[in-house]
A protein has these predicted regions:
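Active-site-proximal helices and loops of the catalytic beta/alpha 8
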Residues: 18, 32, 37, 44, ...
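Carbohydrate-interacting/catalytic domains
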Residues: 181, 241-429
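Structural preference for beta-strand elements that scaffold enzyme active sites
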Residues: 23-25, 111-113, 138-142, 196-199, ...
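Substrate-binding/active-site clefts of carbohydrate-active enzymes
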Residues: 1-101, 105-106, 128-134, 151
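Substrate-binding cleft of secreted/luminal carbohydrate-active enzymes
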Residues: 230-244
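The substrate-binding groove and active-site-proximal loops of carbohydrate-active enzymes
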Residues: 1-7, 78-93, 110-119, 168-174, ...
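Conserved, mostly hydrophobic/aromatic
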Residues: 17, 27, 96, 103, ...
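A structural motif
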Residues: 109, 159, 231-232
Length: 429
């Protein structure tokens, strides 16, 4: 894939990431192939004489596909450009597992995001997990699963994590509809497995959150909840600048723009034939860019302003412009990294209304308390503490503002501005 550069430059990129404490997870499409895949091309050329007749599901030479093939086959959700692989065939499983071995040995990747994991056989996933444990014990397997009971996929025999689409839907509608009850219900329902799930507010298949929110001011409480509720929070590239984008009819182009790096860096990324690989040629991996999709320059002036993905690509504004939203997400990421309670801590609901929501994540004799307000008006809350404390106040880890604790009621008095949230560190005893 030329978008990743050459084998040498991609290995250099992975090595640089490891030097900076960053792990690299690549996308693996093991459910289906394209029509240009060697096995499918051979099947087209040799029909029932091809050694790959059993590589695909339900190959039938009694009828032809809508794309003019002289045979039929099972396609992914009726998309004939994507013929489905037959994972019951040991040759297919061996080929896919050898592919994983290659990417680990050649590039030292740290994990795979399994595309369409909900369509893969459990037997294949279990075999993949055994291989991962064998070749790299800390190798991370995350699956794209949209519907179903996530615990069926997330367990010691299967995957480490799957996409939490339930939270994705409830976290934005909780703000659009002023209904934190929906979000809290999903958190409680997924409590057992929730801390292992991959949480997000937008991705390459879903409209940008800046386009989905009816009120841009909700970006602040929404992202605060993303980083403090159970789960593994993620940011889709460009959304840290408030980029907008909606999925078009049979097109994801607006969701996957090319973000231009600052001009000097862009020049460093040019190959000898003028192609932008998205990877620096000097071995410095501190910055890189996507090399596909329409050009945009990301930037916003306030936390509540957003940037359209159809911005004129000839403007002088470059990617990487620091905005209040960018700074907030940086701060939230730093808080999440520094607080063990936010990694695997037990969840406890403390206060819930349609427009205000407070909960704690428990650590070792301490807790992180988050309170959010989706109303345009300020809210004055009396939030019960998760345990008794001798402290007289608690400090917001985002702003440094302090809030008083009432020793008589064991409640903390929190004044929340409209469309805001706080994260408080509280010590037990």
């Amino acid at each position: 894939d030329r978008r990743l550069g050459t084998n040498v430059s991609f290995r250099s990129f992975v090595d640089c990431c490891h030097e900076h404490g960053i792990r690299v997870v690549v996308d693996g499409v093991f459910n289906h192939t394209g029509r240009e895949f060697f096995a499918f091309r051979d099947l087209q050329a040799h029909r029932d004489q091809s050694p790959y007749t059993r590589w695909y599901r339900n190959v039938n030479f009694d009828w032809g596909s809508p794309l003019g093939d002289s045979f039929g086959y099972e396609s992914w959700h009726g998309i004939w450009e994507l013929p489905c692989l037959n994972h019951r065939n040991p040759e297919v499983r061996d080929y896919l597992l050898d592919t994983v071995r290659f990417w680990v040995q050649e590039f030292d990747i740290d994990g795979i995001r399994l595309d369409c994991a909900g369509d893969l056989s459990f037997e294949f996933i279990q075999e993949l997990r055994r291989l991962a444990n064998e070749i790299k014990p800390e190798f991370w397997l995350m699956g794209e699963v949209i519907h179903g009971e996530y615990a069926r996929w997330v367990n010691p025999q299967m995957l480490h994590s799957v996409t939490n689409y339930e939270m994705h839907k409830s976290i934005y509608s909780a703000h659009n509809d002023h209904n934190y009850f929906e979000l809290a219900h999903n958190v409680r329902r997924l409590e057992v497995v929730g801390r292992e799930l991959y949480t997000f507010v937008d991705n390459h298949d879903e409209d940008r959150i800046a386009s989905k929110l009816l009120n841009p001011a909700h970006l602040a409480p929404l992202y605060t909840l993303l980083f403090t509720l159970p789960g593994i929070p993620s940011i889709y590239y460009g959304s840290e600048w408030g980029i907008q984008g909606r999925r078009g009819h049979n097109s994801d182009t607006e969701l996957r723009p090319r973000i231009l790096p600052p001009r000097p860096l862009a020049e460093e990324m040019q190959t000898s034939d003028g192609q932008n690989t998205g990877i620096r040629t000097d071995g410095n991996c501190q910055s890189f860019s996507s090399a596909t999709g329409p050009n945009i320059h990301a930037g916003a002036n306030t936390c509540c302003q957003t940037t359209s993905s159809t911005t004129d690509s000839n403007t002088d504004t470059s990617a990487g412009t620091v905005t209040p939203l960018t700074l907030l997400i940086q701060k939230l990421a730093a808080i999440h990294a520094a607080e063990p309670a936010l990694h695997g801590g037990r969840y406890q609901e403390l206060l819930l209304t349609n427009r205000q929501y407070a909960f704690a994540r428990h650590g070792d004799h301490q807790a992180i308390l988050t309170a959010a307000n989706n109303d345009d008006n300020a809210a004055y809350l009396q939030v019960p503490l998760p345990f008794h404390t001798t402290a007289e106040q608690a400090t917001d880890l985002i702003t440094g503002k302090s809030f008083l604790i009432d020793k008589n009621t064991n409640k903390i008095q929190i004044e929340l501005e409209g469309n805001s949230a706080v994260i408080l560190g509280i010590t037990e005893g």
